[in-house]
Amino acid sequence: MPKVTKIEVQKKNKERFNLFLDGEFEMGIDIDTLVKFNLKKDQILEPSDMQNIQEYDHYRRGVNLAIQYLSYKKRTEREVIQYLEKNDIQSNAIQDVIDYCYKEKFIDHEDYAESLKNTMIHTTDKGPEIYRQKLYQLGIEVTIIEKYVEAYEQQQPLDDVIKVAEKVMKSKKGPEAKVKQKVTQSLLQKGYKFETIQLVMNEIDFSQDEETLDHLLQRDLEKVYNKNCRKYDSDKSVIKTIEALMRKGYNYDKIKSKLEESGISNE
């Protein structure tokens, strides 16, 4: 049976030790491993002792990796597991490490959800559905997700959502109906619920002055008509142009009037 002949502190890490058996280096061990097994010089080790030492030290390596990983920011269980797997920690040890992290409150999904909620509300233009997706992707339990999504909806000021919508509106040009559609689509993509969007839309003035709309119609008409002329005859080009402009949200009568004004249609 092997005998402990030397235990020395590692030069680069004062909390790890080199374990020598029968005069030869056997392995590096964590200070907690040293204490747990009460290792000392001249100690005789059973074969089962070595297996237990190796398994425990592997677990302690996982714990130290997890603590270091969690020291930079809050993490979820899924994130910690993925990190440990990348660092070659065995699956049975990973579960023990996760249990330790929960016990010491290093992993706390409610705290994580609360922190992410506050960060997103105050620093992003995203709605509760994007928040929901993030929590789901991070492996948060469904019950916690539902609880904190509801809190997100209640705590996000409607005025903030209105500001987001107004910013989007200013970047869009075209008929009122089309601008409303684009703003709605943008808010949906940002994770806002349709009910919230409806409230926001009722608070915004989408009206544009006639001169601006007339200029936009003229610009789009020329662009669309010239494109259609390369594909169709004159009559069909006019029909296709009217259809395209109506899809853009322009009023039929205004389109006809602009066509006549441009000398394209005299009907």
Curated annotation (Swiss-Prot):
PANTHER family: REGULATORY PROTEIN RECX FAMILY PROTEIN (PTHR33602:SF1)
Gene Ontology CC: cytoplasm
A Pfam family assignment: RecX_HTH1
GO biological process per UniProt: regulation of DNA repair
Species of origin: Staphylococcus epidermidis (strain ATCC 35984 / DSM 28319 / BCRC 17069 / CCUG 31568 / BM 3577 / RP62A)
Similarity comment: Belongs to the RecX family.
Protein task: Modulates RecA activity.
Keywords: Cytoplasm
Principal subcellular localization: cytoplasm
Protein name (Swiss-Prot/TrEMBL): Regulatory protein RecX
Intracellular or extracellular location(s): Cytoplasm
Top-level division of the source organism's lineage: Bacteria
Record-linked HAMAP family: RecX
